[in-house]
Amino acid sequence: MESLFIFAFGMMLSSASALSCIPCVPEECEDPGPCEYGKVLDPCQCCLICRKGPGEICGGPWNLQGVCAEGFACITLSGNPVMNLNGGGQEVGRCRKKY
């Protein structure tokens, strides 16, 4: 019984940090218009959104704050790259030129 409780609690924790996406209907996506730094699919992998440019906010959970343009990296205020593993890091950063 205790193992069932631990399993259920673990499932609650994992679902609390999951990204919920509605079913994708590409026809309902808004056109982002011209994007100076290119386009990328949104965090739900459905609609196109503009990539972020130099100095713009990026990262966060599932990269909800945006993805940097090609040749740029999302760098935290502490100077570390935002980790992008299984849904992105929790930290927000700014787009900086890769060297």
Curated annotation (Swiss-Prot):
Q: Name one GO biological process term.
A: regulation of cell growth
Q: Where is the signal peptide?
A: 1-18
| UniProt keyword Protein biosynthesis present | no
Other notes: Does not reveal bactericidal activities against E.coli and S.aureus.
Where in or outside the cell? Secreted
Glycosylation positions? S20
Instruction: Give GO MF terms, alphabetically.
Output: insulin-like growth factor binding
- Which species does this protein come from? Cupiennius salei (American wandering spider)
Q: What is its main location?
A: secreted
Q: Could you say which tissues express the protein in this record?
A: Expressed in hemocytes.
Q: Which is a Gene Ontology cellular component entry for this protein?
A: extracellular region
Its function, per the record, reads:
Has a role in the innate immune system.
- What this protein is called in its record is Single insulin-like growth factor-binding domain protein-2
Q: List each copy of the IGFBP N-terminal domain by range.
A: 19-98
Alphabetically ordered keywords of this record:
Disulfide bond, Glycoprotein, Immunity, Innate immunity, Secreted, Signal
The disulfides recorded in the entry are C21-C44, C24-C46, C29-C47, C35-C50, C58-C74, C68-C95
